[in-house]
A protein has these predicted regions:
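N-terminal Rossmann/SDR dinucleotide-binding element
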Residues: 1-31
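A short helix-to-beta-strand connector/capping loop
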Residues: 2-9, 126-129, 226-229
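C-terminal substrate-binding subdomain of Rossmann-fold SDR/epimerase-dehydratase oxidoreductases
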Residues: 13, 158-262
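Conserved acidic residues
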Residues: 30, 42, 73
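Conserved NAD(P)H cofactor-binding loop of Rossmann-fold oxidoreductase domains
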Residues: 35-39, 79-81
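Catalytic helix-loop patch of NAD(P)-dependent Rossmann-fold dehydrogenases
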Residues: 46-64, 68, 73-74, 83-139, ...
Length: 262
């Protein structure tokens, strides 16, 4: 498709502020989507300092480099649905609900939100740069082979004729195909280009009634795979993970025209 013909590709650690700033000055971007992160909850327990370093200070480095770049007009920072102070209740969380973070990953992403809010009000607003955050539900899709992701874990286990270990089968999550939030990020970035009121947090995910338990998702995967043994846990072992999490996505639907399709 020759997609790469018009792309400049650089790989670097966002914790390296000087290299990051140099790349930004070289690229002179107009629209920025910031997705770099340490994105695994369980890894955040084993290495919390790296998680905070990448997600909080790494984001600060990105934003600080961008505030010195006059070409920038639209910035979308992707955080997570886990930034909310989870009450384990049946109501979906709205963008204005209280933030929190029981585990290091969630806390680091809440810190990201605070860093964004500070840079937005302190530096970007006066320059006419719109900075938004995107809070997406659990994503499923090709290319993700990270550990502790339910579908990749299932494929690895069943392909090797092994039993899939499921820690919390009754946990409820706002599952969505990866194409959905990616499209939403692009819509948000486009809106932020021309509309300063987009400078806020946005939830992206399925409708509330489409949220499903881990057991239900594994059942669908089993049917698609055609086989596969599962060992169901009771959620008592291992570090804390939220049991019930849903998002209110009515803001994105009403103001951006974004809603789940798949």
């Amino acid at each position: 498709a020759k997609v790469g013909d018009n792309l400049a590709h650089h790989e670097l650690d966002i914790c390296d502020a000087s290299k990051l700033a140099a790349i930004v000055q070289q690229a002179k971007p107009e629209i920025v989507l910031h997705l770099a992160a340490q994105a695994l909850v369980r890894e955040s327990y084993s290495d919390p300092l790296r998680t905070f370093s990448v997600n909080v200070m790494g984001t600060a480095n990105v934003l600080d480099a961008l505030r010195h770049c006059d070409s920038v007009r639209s910035i979308v920072v992707v955080t997570t649905d886990k930034v909310y102070a989870n009450q384990e209740w049946i109501w979906p969380y709205r963008e204005t609900d209280r933030l929190g973070g029981h585990d290091p990953y969630s806390a680091s992403k809440t810190g990201t939100e605070i860093v964004v809010a500070s840079y937005r009000s302190s530096f970007f607003a006066a320059k006419g740069v719109t900075v938004a955050t995107a809070r997406a539900g659990n994503v499923i899709g090709g290319g993700d082979w990270s550990a502790d992701r339910i579908i990749p874990d299932a494929v690895r286990a069943w392909s090797a004729n092994e039993t899939l270990q499921v820690r919390r089968p009754q946990a409820v999550r706002p599952w969505q195909h990866v194409i959905e939030p990616l499209c939403a990020y692009l819509v948000l970035a486009e809106r932020a280009w021309s509309d300063a009121t987009a400078a806020k947090a946005w939830n992206f995910g399925p409708q509330t009634h489409e949220a499903a338990t881990v057991r239900e998702v594994v059942g669908i995967a089993q049917a698609a795979f055609g086989q596969g043994q599962v060992q169901w846990g009771d959620g008592k072992d291992g570090p804390h993970e939220a049991g019930l999490l849903m998002l209110d996505t009515s803001l994105a639907k009403s103001q951006l025209g974004v809603q789940s399709v798949f």
